[in-house]
Amino acid sequence: MLKQAVEPTGGFSFENCQRNASLEHVLPGLRVPHARKTGTTIAGLVFRDGVILGADTRATNDSVVADKSCEKIHFIAPKIYCCGAGVAADTEMTTRMAASKMELHALSTGREPRVATVTRILRQTLFRYQGHVGASLVVGGVDLNGPQLYEVHPHGSYSRLPFTALGSGQGAAVALLEDRFQPNMTLEAAQELLVEAITAGILSDLGSGGNVDACVITAGGAKLQRALSTPTEPVQRAGRYRFAPGTTPVLTREVRPLTLELLEETVQAMEVE
């Protein structure tokens, strides 16, 4: 009977998870590594002539703003784009993989890529890792079936919707889209609604911020617009706060000498031939 020479292994290793759980149980007060909170607001909607996608531009590292102008709308095909929320590295590499596969698919078949094909590739890839690839995606594009919009979750589930929003600011964005969305909207009305939805997510979520980027996709092509709107203008300081020495009184002062005790001293001569 034939057997595999090497056992198949997954792309992730969780060997240290049980170790961390044991250490946390044995050593009270131990701070084990925790999952990072990610923040983003991405949205998309279908209008009369195509699809429009939008995203904020803030990238965070826990409570630190790592990038104020992060591009979250990724190219997949000439008429298909994808917004990514979650771990920036995961969304970037996942969309790059999908773009390369669609380029090979177009060269081998001689046909333009379809939005459903891109969505299938993305959800199969994410389902394979069972949610450990932190990428929440909004895929939009125009093909021979007309304008289409999909949302793909990190575990591989997906939905086709006329409008959607994902990320930590999706609550405020979806509320605005549900209230004001109408079928067969004009480009101007759809763009205004999208900017207001992303702005609502930025103003209600600390993980979202920066500018509003948008991508308009029609049968004639796609147009990516960077910094379409700036909801929060940077505020300049009113002045410099430098206080002279002695402004704040010192209430108490205590100096403790640092005493060191030499426990053992060993001197070993080097052997020289």
From Swiss-Prot:
Q: Which residues form the signal peptide?
A: none
Role summary: The proteasome is a multicatalytic proteinase complex which is characterized by its ability to cleave peptides with Arg, Phe, Tyr, Leu, and Glu adjacent to the leaving group at neutral or slightly basic pH. The proteasome has an ATP-dependent proteolytic activity. This subunit is involved in antigen processing to generate class I binding peptides. Plays a role in determining the T-cell repertoire for an antiviral T-cell response.
Q: What is its EC number?
A: 3.4.25.1
- The primary gene name is Psmb10
Q: Which CDD domains match?
A: proteasome_beta_type_7
Q: What induces it?
A: Up-regulated by interferon gamma (at protein level). Up-regulated by IRF1.
Name the catalytic site residues. T40 (nucleophile)
In terms of Pfam families, this protein maps to: Pr_beta_C (PF12465), Proteasome (PF00227)
Full protein name? Proteasome subunit beta type-10
GO BP term, example: T cell proliferation
State the GO CC annotations.
cytosol; nucleoplasm; proteasome core complex; proteasome core complex, beta-subunit complex; spermatoproteasome complex
Q: Does the keyword Protease apply?
A: yes
Which reactions does this protein catalyse? Cleavage of peptide bonds with very broad specificity
Mark the residues carrying the PTM N-acetylmethionine. M1
Q: Where in the cell is it found?
A: Cytoplasm; Nucleus
Phenotype of null mutants:
Impaired response of cytotoxic T-lymphocyte (CTL) to dominant epitopes of lymphocytic choriomeningitis virus (LCMV).
Could you list this entry's UniProt keywords, alphabetically sorted.
Acetylation, Cytoplasm, Hydrolase, Nucleus, Protease, Proteasome, Threonine protease, Zymogen
Q: What is its main location?
A: cytoplasm
> What PTMs does it carry?
Autocleaved. The resulting N-terminal Thr residue of the mature subunit is responsible for the nucleophile proteolytic activity.
Propeptide feature: residues: 1-39
Its family remark reads: Belongs to the peptidase T1B family.
